[in-house]
Amino acid sequence: MSKLALDRKLAALEALRSSDDRAASRDQLRKALNDRNNYVVSRAAAIAADMRRDELLPDVLAAFDRFFVDPVKTDPQCLAKNALASALRDLGHRGAEAFSRGIVHVQLEPTWGGRADSAGTLRGICALALADCPLDPLEILTYLADGLADPDKLVRINSAIAISQLGRPEGVLLLRLKLLSGDGEPDVLGQCFTSLLGLAPTGGVSFVSRFLRSTDEEVRLEAASALAQCRDPRAVEALAEFWQEPLLSLDVRRAIVIGLGASPLPEAANFLLTCVSHEPPELAETAIASLATSRFQAESRPRLAAAVHARANAHLKSIFDQKFSPATPT
């Protein structure tokens, strides 16, 4: 297919978004889903999902199956399968067979000096989708346990998210083991901390707090950020104790302050007000900004104004006036 022909086909597909003729747009999307070009199919799948055309689910599923045949040739970079898997999930498909096929798919494609797997995104999409399928939860957790050890970072992150979404207590054990085993990517550990705290806040706070003592600065930062977003007041207590560490870096302290700004807990707002009163100006400034976007913005304003006034710091006064001006939405 020439570039001009491809561009025309893609433009025609995009035009379907504003079409008032549902029958005609359905037929054109169905035809595009059956196209040999994987990019055309990927766009058709995305448009079908965006338009909530769930009557096309059988066509999306058939296209998904088709691109597993000679996949390196028919679907380089998994463009079609990625979009089709996302469309299946977004359109409400809950059949586990498609997603269990996708979560184990590895597609090695030629690269400079060897071959590389292009199916990481697909496995990550299917990990999230499986959590919503009416499959035995232990079978789902088996897939997700493998996902936590996947070579692709996105798959590991999405597997941790899916474990939390599944909501099974057995998932706590997988997350604890993963955290104790470690991961070279701090983002993965951060998601595991967050998922664990969501599943088991009672025991999770004490477990995640252990990692505040890690010798790895990035691990400490991820653990602190996850605790700051936790809805258990004991997490704020753990962070307050951790805050007393004399060698705690400015980056970790700033991450705690920013994270607490998103907390729904009044204890978090009190902590931030204390920071404004007693911490160095750079941290006090961050605490003011965090309070300005928190759910406690309005009720904390009088105490915050008093704390800023007591500091007698022109820069902090300027930040407060900027963040808490009358035009600032509450």
What are the functions of these language-model segments?
Residues R301, V308-S318:
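Short glycine/proline-enriched turn or capping motifs at secondary-structure junctions
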Residues M1-D21, Y39-D54, K73-H93, G113-D136, ...:
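Structural detector for internal amphipathic alpha-helices that build alpha-solenoid repeat scaffolds
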Residues R36-N37, M51-D59, A63:
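Short, charge-rich amphipathic alpha-helical segments embedded
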Residues I256, L304-A306:
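Short, highly charge-biased, low-complexity peptide segments
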Residues R295-R303:
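Intrinsically disordered, low-complexity coil segments
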Residues D27-N34, A45-I47:
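Short secondary-structure junction/hinge motifs that connect adjacent elements
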Residues Q28-A32, D59-V72, A98-R115, Y143-P151, ...:
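Alpha-solenoid HEAT/Armadillo-like helical repeat scaffolds in large eukaryotic proteins
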Residues R22-R26, L57, A96, S100, ...:
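Core helices of alpha-solenoid repeat scaffolds
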